[in-house]
Every structure is written in C-alpha cells, then in structure tokens.
Amino acid sequence: MAQKKGGGSTRNGRDSESKRLGVKVFGGQAINAGGIIVRQRGTRVHAGDNVGVGKDHTLFALIDGHVQFAVKGPAKKQQVSVVPAA
C-alpha cells in the first residue's frame, strides 16, 4: 500500500521574469556618456540630440550632461535629449 496520496499535477506555478523596463534617468538628472536613459520595447520614447539607440531600442547618452524630455510634433511623440552640462 502507498504511504502517501498521489501528488497530482498543477497547471499553475510558472511566471516570466520581469524585464525591468522603463525610465532609468529622469528629466533634469545628470548622466554620463554611455549611461542608460530608457529601457523599452519598441520606440515609445524617441531619441533626440546626443542620444543613441541600442539594438533592443534602449536609449543611452552619447555625451555627459543632463537629461531633457520633450513632446514633439503633431503626433505628440515623447523625445529625450541630453544637453551638455554648463
């Protein structure tokens, strides 16, 4: 005789790991060249002056300076730029 009842299976118990997306450096904050500004899927935020785009659409600073967000154009697209520190 079995000493334990059958365990049975469950259809739950798994979830994907969070991807830690979002804005990493906010408007007005200082950033060094190469620093990540936004991690995103697709181009929710577009690259402005002195901002590069990675192959996974990550936005990063090309120069040392301060981050500046703006809404541009008739489609009201959000854009991020890096302005040199004065």
Swiss-Prot record:
Keywords: Ribonucleoprotein, Ribosomal protein
Start-end of Gly residues biased regions: 1-10
InterPro entries the record matches: Ribosomal_bL27, Ribosomal_bL27_CS
Stretches the record annotates as Disordered: 1-21
Domain of life: Bacteria
GO terms under cellular component: cytosolic large ribosomal subunit
GO molecular function: structural constituent of ribosome
GO annotation (BP), single: translation
Family as reported in the entry's similarity comment: Belongs to the bacterial ribosomal protein bL27 family.
Annotated protein name in UniProt: Large ribosomal subunit protein bL27
Organism of derivation: Cupriavidus taiwanensis (strain DSM 17343 / BCRC 17206 / CCUG 44338 / CIP 107171 / LMG 19424 / R1)
Encoding gene (name): rpmA
